């Protein structure tokens, strides 16, 4: 925001150099990007060359049709002859003259000259030459009351120092001259007048006789106020107003529009002026746009609106995109005589969405989207009416139409001085804290040990005690807070059991040859279809992201597998033939509350060969048993026992997958070969890929807190092989589990080394060849002991799973 220093000085006395002011603003959180000198070079010696002149006579140049020879009184003993090319120069007008020796805004030095044979001792200035406009058709005409020879700088801001300020999003109150002046007053400890007024006369007609106002969308328009000014004359703005508008970075239009822009910059409240004659039905309605409704805005563009956009309409059509830009149909023209003046407060998020959707940003929308003070509207309307009467004439209809939500009482925050010193590391006097808050516009009431602070309506960012403490520290000055070293605290940090378990899982999987990856926690809504999940599968109920970065990241993941498959697909696309990856991350599930449930899971994926061919041996092909072996290796490293049973996951290959359970039978995940149709969806066709995904919290929770030591036996094992005939559909794990139970403590291990299905076993049966290893910790087992235990085990499995010994 551009803030002319002379304009700021109308609200606050700036008694320090502008460079120091810029530095102090920056140190308190309001960055001044640069201090620019605009207009005429501003030293006093140069300004003395710019004087008021009276054109006494004008005659046609003898040798140029477009030039005039003027006799101009500039307050000297004798008038000067000045050649001028402006079409509006004539005898009797008051003008601005630069005398020879004066330096123009562009650096040109004015000299005595001869123009087509006629001597010219100076130059009569236009608004463009003064820096008030980009271009102007003629010279500037000044009020006749100004005296010849007076300095123009005594009447107009010829030279201006402009602060270009970067205002933070939480401080919309500083997007105005008055708001920035209040901040300067607080920083420099000079008086600031909070209570100001702009009195003006009223007419005889009541405003409700001219127009009515309805608000159909109070959620988008909490307050809408209107006044009517009748009988105005639209004309060019006076030079002083053009100068102010131009120095603030805006373009002068006409007196009526320039008044609204002046108020916007002065107070920070956007206003909009309608041509009352163009308001159909003399009715103003703040409503949502109709779907597909169109409006031609002031820039000549036809805007197509949506039903979530707010418009200001009359009885027949939309006239304004609220808070963004007015429409061509109701704009102020040279023929306008009656003006409807709007002062409103609109929903910031709504204005931001509309501005983004339409691709339009304006000074008004910039302020609305940050959240404005609704109590500022009456003051802004008063100021605008006063200026309208002064510059445009007319009368103000009596009263204000003001439609608003119920007024909210001021926010009251308790502030503890002791807490201020504790957080800031200071020992500030209580009186200084009170003074700082009062200078910021707060009402401070001393309640003994605490303050009750009433926050002004223009500071919506002050919600909690810590916000007030920040303000105290900011205005006191961060540089004034003494530096202190943090206290030394002995002792070492440590890891929680969960962190230790996670680190161990990572180490085990890295040790197994896998690389850790981190994938996005977001995905699109089609990932569950690509995984062929059942319509009733709870994992389809993904949490939608409120503000997604893109359409393909609109849902929180409920599984790690999609991210692992996408990573594998990208690696295969770069001709990486062996992918061994794992991830430990969170999945997100609907909870019925504000936030979703989060679960930590560990998953891995192996695609391509598990081990490549070498000169000495053939490679190992990736299959289900690679994934199962990795899962068992992980469990063994954690000291956890796991069981496996057939799985029915549709994204896994049928017959080559398993549900993973803890010793109590509680499911903690799955392992298996990825279905070929799923691999096609992720550009992995032609590859074999296996994966597993486990509940990391449950898995780590099964880990014993204290590892149990088991002494190594010095006695030899006794091994025996046997073949059992069982039902073809019986999981081998059930046979192994039954043998383990029956074998007791002397059975050291059970390994399956062969599976046979053929003519040598009955139909519907299969043969499992198992190697049993027996060992005692305190003696050598005899053959009789082992045979006896083996017989007991055969009887047990025959009873529990229907197994018979194959002979």
Model-derived segments and their meaning:
Residues 1-205, 340, 359, 363, ...:
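Phosphate-backbone binding interfaces of nucleic-acid-interacting proteins
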Residues 179, 413-579, 773-775, 781, ...:
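Extended, well-folded interaction surfaces typified by the phenylalanyl-tRNA synthetase beta subunit core
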């Amino acid at each position: 925001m551009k803030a002319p220093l002379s304009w700021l000085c109308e609200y606050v006395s700036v008694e320090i150099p502008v460079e120091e002011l810029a530095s102090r603003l920056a140190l308190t959180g309001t960055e001044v990007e640069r201090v620019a000198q605009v207009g005429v070079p501003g030293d006093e010696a140069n300004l003395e060359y710019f004087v008021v002149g009276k054109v006494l006579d004008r005659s046609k140049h003898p040798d140029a049709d477009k030039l005039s020879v003027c006799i101009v009184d500039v307050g000297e003993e004798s008038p000067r002859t000045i050649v001028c090319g402006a079409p509006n120069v004539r005898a009797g007008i008051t003008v601005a003259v630069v005398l020879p020796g004066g330096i123009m805004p562009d650096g040109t030095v004015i000299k005595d000259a001869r123009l087509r044979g006629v001597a010219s001792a100076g130059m009569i200035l236009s608004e463009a030459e003064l820096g008030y406009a980009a271009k102007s058709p003629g010279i500037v005409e000044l009020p006749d009351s100004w005296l010849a020879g007076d300095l123009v700088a005594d009447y107009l801001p010829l030279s201006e120092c402009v602060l270009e300020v970067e205002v933070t999003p939480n401080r919309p109150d500083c997007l105005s001259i008055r708001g920035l002046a209040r901040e300067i007053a607080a920083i420099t400890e000079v008086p600031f007048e909070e209570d100001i007024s702009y009195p003006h006369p009223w007419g005889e007609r009541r405003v409700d006789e001219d127009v009515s106002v309805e608000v159909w969308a109070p959620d988008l328009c909490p307050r809408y106020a209107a006044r009517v000014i009748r009988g105005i004359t639209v004309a060019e703005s006076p030079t002083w107003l053009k100068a102010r508008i131009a120095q603030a970075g805006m373009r002068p239009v006409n007196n009526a529009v320039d008044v609204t822009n002046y108020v916007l910059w002065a107070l920070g409240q956007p206003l909009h002026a309608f041509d009352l004659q163009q308001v159909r039905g003399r009715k103003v309605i703040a409503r949502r746009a109709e779907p597909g409704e169109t409006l031609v805005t002031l820039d000549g563009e036809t805007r197509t609106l949506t039903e979530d956009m707010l418009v200001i309409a009359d009885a027949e059509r939309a006239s304004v995109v609220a808070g963004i830009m007015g429409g061509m149909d109701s704009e102020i023209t040279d023929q306008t005589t009656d003006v409807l003046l709007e002062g409103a407060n609109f929903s910031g998020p709504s204005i931001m969405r509309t501005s983004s959707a339409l691709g339009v940003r304006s000074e008004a929308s910039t302020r609305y989207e940050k959240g404005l003070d609704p109590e500022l509207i009456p003051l802004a309307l008063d100021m605008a009416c006063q200026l309208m009467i002064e510059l445009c004439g007319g009368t103000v209809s009596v009263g204000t139409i003001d439609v608003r939500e119920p007024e909210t009482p001021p926010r009251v925050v308790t502030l503890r001085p002791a807490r201020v010193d504790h957080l800031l590391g200071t020992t500030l006097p209580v009186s200084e804290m009170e003074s700082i808050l009062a200078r910021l516009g707060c009402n401070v009431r001393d309640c003994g040990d605490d303050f009750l602070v009433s926050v002004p309506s223009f500071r919506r960012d002050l919600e909690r005690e810590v916000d007030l403490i920040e303000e105290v520290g900011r205005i006191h000055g961060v540089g004034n807070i003494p530096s202190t070293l943090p206290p030394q605290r002995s002792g070492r940090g440590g890891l929680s059991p969960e962190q230790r378990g996670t680190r161990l899982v990572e180490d085990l999987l890295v040790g197994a040859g896998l690389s850790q990856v981190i994938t996005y926690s977001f995905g699109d809504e089609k990932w569950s279809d690509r995984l062929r999940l059942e319509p009733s599968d709870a994992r389809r109920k993904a949490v939608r992201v409120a503000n997604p970065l893109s359409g393909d990241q609109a849902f929180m993941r409920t599984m790690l597998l999609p991210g692992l498959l996408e990573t594998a697909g990208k690696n295969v696309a770069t001709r990486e033939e062996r992918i061994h990856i794992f991830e430990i991350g969170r999945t997100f599930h609907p909870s019925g509350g504000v936030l979703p449930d989060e679960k930590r899971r560990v998953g891995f994926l192996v695609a391509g060969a598990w081990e490549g061919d070498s000169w000495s041996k053939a490679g190992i092909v990736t299959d289900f048993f690679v994934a199962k072996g990795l899962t068992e290796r992980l469990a063994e490293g954690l000291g956890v026992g796991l069981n496996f049973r057939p799985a029915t996951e549709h994204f896994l290959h049928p017959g080559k997958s398993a549900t993973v359970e803890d010793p109590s039978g509680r499911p903690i995940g799955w392992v298996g070969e990825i279905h070929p149709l799923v691999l096609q969806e992720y550009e992995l066709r032609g590859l074999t890929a296996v994966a597993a995904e486990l509940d990391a919290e449950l898995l780590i929770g099964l880990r014993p807190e204290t590892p149990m030591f088991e002494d190594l036996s010095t006695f030899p094992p006794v091994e025996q092989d046997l073949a059992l005939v069982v039902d073809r559909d019986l999981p081998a794990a059930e046979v192994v589990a039954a043998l383990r139970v029956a074998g007791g403590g002397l059975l050291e291990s059970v390994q399956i080394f062969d599976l046979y299905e053929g003519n040598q076993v009955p139909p519907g049966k299969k043969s499992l060849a198992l190697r049993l290893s027996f060992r005692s910790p305190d003696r050598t087992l005899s053959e009789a002991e082992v045979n006896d235990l083996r017989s007991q085990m055969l009887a047990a499995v025959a009873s529990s799973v229907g197994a018979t010994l194959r002979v």
